[in-house]
């Protein structure tokens, strides 16, 4: 009887581990690129590591983080991440580190794509804004078990 209980408990724990392994934990950041010295009242400069990577790819002098969201998305499920009053990111976990991404600007589709998120690399996409500024959305899988080692940015 005890061995049956052990087998049942082991099976339950394995199923729970497999189910959570299918969940994707990701980080999303809304970033504003500008030549202005200050961001808005709710903006803060992006961390130096991400700023260095953005400076290497884009022309703006300063990059300000507007929103930082963490989400856990079960396999084959979709989550909406409200990045600002004007920007929502819709993310569907397709499995195997693949995601279907939709960017909604003021409720209207702006861009849709399927990408692979490879920890700890950043996926960055964005567009022009008013007054020679730009917005960027940075996404990365937060499933990396190795910690913060060698975080990099990829331009897609």
Regions found by a protein language model. Name each.
Residues 11-12, 147:
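N-terminal compositionally biased, intrinsically disordered segments and leader/signal-like regions
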Residues 1-9:
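Bacterial N-terminal signal peptides that target proteins for export
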Residues 22-156:
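Outer membrane pore-forming secretion/assembly proteins and partners of Gram-negative envelopes
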Residues 12-20:
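Hydrophobic h-region of N-terminal signal peptides that target proteins for export
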């Amino acid at each position: 009887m005890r061995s049956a209980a052990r087998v049942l408990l082991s099976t339950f724990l394995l199923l729970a581990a497999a189910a959570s392994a299918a969940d994707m934990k990701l980080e999303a950041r809304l970033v504003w690129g500008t030549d202005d010295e200050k961001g808005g009242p709710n903006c803060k400069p992006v961390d130096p590591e991400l700023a260095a990577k953005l400076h290497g790819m884009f022309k703006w002098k300063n990059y300000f983080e507007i929103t930082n969201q963490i989400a856990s998305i079960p396999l084959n499920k979709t989550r909406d991440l409200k990045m600002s009053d004007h920007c929502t990111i819709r993310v569907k976990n397709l499995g195997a580190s693949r995601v279907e991404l939709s960017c909604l600007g003021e409720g209207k589709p702006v861009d849709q794509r399927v990408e692979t998120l490879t920890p700890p690399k950043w996926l960055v996409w964005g567009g022009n804004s008013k007054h020679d500024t730009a917005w960027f959305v940075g996404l990365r899988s937060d499933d990396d078990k190795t910690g913060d080692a060698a975080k990099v940015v990829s331009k897609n």
